[in-house]
Amino acid sequence: MDNRRFYLLTLLPPLPALGEQPAVTLPEALGLLRQQGGRDFELLADTLGAENELRDALAEWVRNTPVTRSAPAALPPFLTALFDEERIADFAEDAWVDAVWQAWFGEVAHAGRSIGSRLLPRWVAWETALRSRLARRRAGGGAEDEPRVTLDEPGDPPDLDAVVAAWHAAREQGAAEGPLPVAVEAELLLERARLDFLDAEDPRYSFSLDELVAYLLKLRLLDRRARLEPEAGRSLLRRAVAL
């Protein structure tokens, strides 16, 4: 047993229910990983930590014009290379943003394989498949147009049909109940599905790398939910309803 993992998994506080404030933030937890040292922990912390930096960089980038903006210095090189005006000119903005996120997810999967995590590549495959299906449904595609999820890892691939169908049904109720409350419920449904996937994959009480990874991925979701300002959340949901 790796003493670093045992120490961290006994030190980190229990995770709360969805919607409650975690006792530790994701950046704080990643800081604890870095304090333990080791290439595996540093790579895991750097890769997961790049997500918040990427969100900030994308928000700053779209607010500025090509004349005033420059490649974000805080991002790792594999992401900085995508913030190139000539490269961006070949894409519609939405397609470019999708490509940037695909690069981050791809790096997470690669990092997982590099450090011996089975869960990280499986989570990336599940999350990106879910996002792809939701995008197709938002664009008016039917269930028959949705690709099957493959995880390229041992174990049975999860079935996303029920998740996407329930999300679609919740959105369809908006005509009768009002779009914003239904959008809130649809978003909560997705967050519960994400937590359910991680719970099913979590090798609890093993003090393994993937138990630590599962903790961090759950904390990522809970921390983001707790940090979402109410008005910002309503604004995001209004945009989601309009899609």
Please provide the spans of the model-predicted regions.
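Extended alpha-helical surfaces
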Residues: 1-243
